[in-house]
C-alpha cells in the first residue's frame, strides 16, 4: 500500500475515498478537508474569534490542533463535569487538555462546575431524580448552556464543536427512526447566531471518527482514551455500531447518508424552525436573562437553583 501523493509506504487507507496516505500526507489531507468544510458552509473566517469546546478526547484536540495549524484564532473551553466516580474521567481529561494548550501556547478557559455551582454533574442529576440513573441529559443541558454563555460573555464570534461524521450520522439515524422533524430541521452543521445564542459550527461533520483518531495518534497528541463512564450502553453508541455495520458492507455509507440529509434539508424536506428575534425577546429567564420558553427561570437556572 503506497501513499497516493509521494509513493512512500502508506500508514492509512481510507476505504470510502479509495486512497492511502503516508503520515505526512494524511495530516495534510485532514487539514485540507477541514478547511474545505469551513469554506463550504461559510462557517467562520480567520479574522473571527472562535471558542472551541474541548473535552480532552481525540476529536476536540485534533480539531483544535488543525484550526491552530490553519491559522484560525481559536481559544479552548474546558468544562470540568466532576465525573470521577468510576474512573478519573474528568480529572484526567482536564490534565490532557491543560497540557495540550500549554505545549502550543493556546488560550484555555476552564470552568469547574462543582466549584462554580456547588455540585458536580452526577450530583445534580441524583438530586433532580428524574427516574434516570444516568446524568447525560442534565450534562448535555449544562454543557450547551455554559458553552453558549461563555462564548457570549467572551464576545466570541462562533462556538466550534468537534462532532464528527459518526456522531452526526448517529444523531441523524436516531432522529430519522423517530421522525423527530423538529431535530431534523436543526441538524445543519452551521447554526447562525440569534438573540441570546452564539453561532455554532461543526467543521468535522464530514470527518470519520477513525480519521480524527488517526490524526491525533499520528501527530502525537496525547488524549484521553477512556470514554465518559455513563456513555456505556447509550443509544448513541448502539446507533454508531449499526452504522459501522452498514459502512463495513458499503464503504462511504455514512457520508452518503449525511450528505443526502443535507440535500433534503436544503430542498425544504424538514421544517427549519428558526425562532424570530422578536419571539426570543418575548420571554427571558428571570435570573440569567437567557431567552426561554417557560415562565420564570430557564431550564438551566431551574436545574442549578434547587
Ligand atoms: Fe456528560 Fe457523560 S454524562 S459526558
Ligand atoms: Zn505521502
Ligand atoms: Zn436562566
Regions found by a protein language model. Name each.
Residues 2-185, 194-197, 209-219, 285, ...:
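ATP-dependent adenylation/nucleotidyltransferase module used to activate substrates
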Amino acid at each position: 500500500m503506497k501513499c497516493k501523493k509521494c509513493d512512500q509506504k502508506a500508514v492509512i487507507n481510507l476505504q470510502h475515498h479509495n486512497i492511502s496516505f503516508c503520515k505526512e500526507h494524511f495530516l495534510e489531507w485532514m487539514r485540507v478537508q477541514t478547511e474545505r468544510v469551513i469554506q463550504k458552509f461559510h462557517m467562520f473566517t480567520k479574522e473571527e474569534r472562535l471558542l472551541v469546546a474541548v473535552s480532552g478526547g481525540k476529536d476536540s484536540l485534533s480539531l483544535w490542533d488543525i484550526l491552530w495549524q490553519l491559522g484560525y484564532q481559536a481559544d479552548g473551553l474546558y468544562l470540568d463535569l466532576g465525573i470521577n466516580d468510576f474512573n478519573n474521567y474528568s480529572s484526567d481529561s482536564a490534565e490532557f487538555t491543560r497540557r495540550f494548550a500549554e505545549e502550543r501556547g493556546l488560550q484555555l478557559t476552564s470552568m469547574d462546575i462543582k466549584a462554580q455551582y456547588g455540585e458536580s454533574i452526577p450530583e445534580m442529576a441524583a438530586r433532580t431524580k428524574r427516574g434516570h440513573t444516568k446524568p447525560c441529559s442534565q450534562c448535555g443541558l449544562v454543557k450547551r448552556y455554559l458553552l453558549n454563555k461563555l462564548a457570549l460573555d467572551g464576545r466570541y464570534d462562533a462556538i466550534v464543536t468537534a462532532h464528527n461524521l459518526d456522531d452526526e450520522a448517529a444523531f441523524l439515524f436516531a432522529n430519522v427512526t423517530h421522525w423527530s422533524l423538529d431535530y431534523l430541521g436543526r441538524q445543519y452543521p452551521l447554526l447562525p447566531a440569534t438573540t441570546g445564542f452564539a453561532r455554532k459550527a461543526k467543521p468535522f461533520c464530514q470527518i470519520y471518527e477513525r480519521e480524527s483518531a488517526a490524526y491525533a495518534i499520528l501527530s502525537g497528541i496525547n488524549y484521553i482514551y477512556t470514554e465518559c463512564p455513563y456513555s456505556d450502553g447509550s443509544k448513541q453508541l448502539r446507533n454508531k455500531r449499526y452504522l459501522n455495520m452498514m459502512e463495513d458492507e458499503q464503504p462511504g455509507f455514512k457520508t452518503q447518508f449525511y450528505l443526502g440529509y443535507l440535500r433534503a434539508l436544503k430542498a425544504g424536506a424538514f421544517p427549519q424552525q428558526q425562532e424570530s428575534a422578536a419571539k426570543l425577546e418575548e420571554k427571558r429567564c428571570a435570573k440569567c436573562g437567557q431567552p426561554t420558553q417557560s415562565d420564570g427561570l430557564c431550564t438551566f437556572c431551574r436545574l442549578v437553583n434547587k
